[in-house]
């Protein structure tokens, strides 16, 4: 799957930001709340406006245009009843705002969200996974990144202005709001849907024009107009993630977390990222499409822990599992009471402002101010702990730092790596059956649509042991649709698979023991010289990154150019990152690591991390090319160790043929030809035993034959 232009949940920060780097890591002092910011290797908290000009041959405009302007054939102005309805609420008692911001995220800053929380999609009609909508009394604008420009052009009606975030001349959402509102405007947000960092930066930018940020705790305006048609919240049962896949029991994970809490000089941590909660507790859910997580919050203290979750999802088995780990259950909606209770007992709270919503942090701030008078105001001693009946003895305070779970989860243990390797091989077998079927059908001139193809792939995957779900919506794009980077085919509007055009398929699966993500681009007939050249240069970038060796401590952005260099040589590029982290039977997009041109992410790649390798090239309204494998970061064997440094490299997890018909061999070096032939030999060796007794094995043999050197 395409890496986010910034690491998830980044687009809020991208469109609200005013500088390339995170400059507002500190919120205002909490008066009596002692606030410290601890620096760790960290992903960028806010995206920047991209000032570099594009070198792509893309025909997309760099400036903001309304959807009406893009579709000139549309002459009738659309009366958007949803916009009219939400604007009427601006003047309601307790609201009183001039603009309202609707982000993509839920209260946990999730990339994928339950249908009932898809508020931005509901209000705008744009269904891409990343974007921010802003509605004023007379304007409506939507920001999204380069993966979704073409999709947004198609889906937005003429009432909306499309803002191509990151392109030169395009303001961020906060800048635009500050400019279009009359001085003294009031900008409303749902504080549960914004990270504390994003809210603080927004507040700073609009304050320059004397605007006020208003937290609407008690009402979400989109929910008010959605009403009875809004889907119900998910209520599926939670399951235990088996220790043979997790590799580490809950007690061990909590012990490590508590040690880190105390090392930071704190006594508790509040966790809202759903994959972090699932990982720590060895639990999995199905509340969110494509991600095996459940809606919950987790508070871990030195001597106790509370899970805030809908109790109807908790089976007897899961209750026993949590009880054995010393975890008490609390209602999901009582999280703010839980935060208040921490302050009342004088907790020293570790908070990650890039992931915690501003409702939680503001509640803790207010509670600390309220309860601090109950403590010795002159006490400057370190935190001391008492038993749970007595509570804490220190003034309540907080420290901002990256969640330690993010790092622990990113570095896979042996059991997690084993599960990832095994699940990838089963996935490869399913893919082989699928591609063999698809090629045969296309050659028989079957009338297949992009949706037909995606549905059939799901059928093949569902036959594999341990299959749970897809890991994201399958990107099945024929011809020009392949250039829509996060294209999602719909039954009523998708294209037929055209054998005379390139076909791009980006797909993945969730298995009980691992998560997969793979992209292949093929031609069912004869590709043009242009298509072969572009494909080959993408392949060269893929090989260059796969073969990279680098010193320990190297951040991902240093490697990004490896994947682009071959394209750069002929003046081409692509508008997305090259690699994202991947969870082990968890989110297909995982931080803090990434491989991207955005050099604000200083997170070093470390042994045990998993990243994708997916360079691409796209010509709008023509074709798209992408080649993606998943890689495991591991120690590299080098003849020297300069300065005593450890060097790292990559081990492939994905084993599936790359179509050699698309390769212009004359462009490849001998080393690159050897890489491709060696890779295909490994594919045959590892996957063919899973295809014994099937005609698909012959298909795999045909597609893994060595490529002759020129």
Swiss-Prot record:
It is an enzyme of class 3 (hydrolase). It catalyses: Release of any N-terminal amino acid, including proline, that is linked to proline, even from a dipeptide or tripeptide. Its main location: plastid. Its cofactor is Mn(2+). It holds the Pfam family Peptidase_M24. InterPro entries: Creatin/AminoP/Spt16_N, Creatinase/aminopeptidase-like, Creatinase_N, Pept_M24, Pept_M24B, Peptidase_M24_C, X-Pro_aminopeptidase_P. Keywords: Aminopeptidase, Chloroplast, Hydrolase, Manganese, Metal-binding, Metalloprotease, Plastid, Protease, Transit peptide. Its EC number is 3.4.11.9. Belongs to the peptidase M24B family. Catalyzes the removal of a penultimate prolyl residue from the N-termini of peptides, such as Arg-Pro-Pro. This is Aminopeptidase P2. It comes from Arabidopsis thaliana (Mouse-ear cress). The lineage of its organism: Eukaryota, Viridiplantae, Streptophyta, Embryophyta, Tracheophyta.
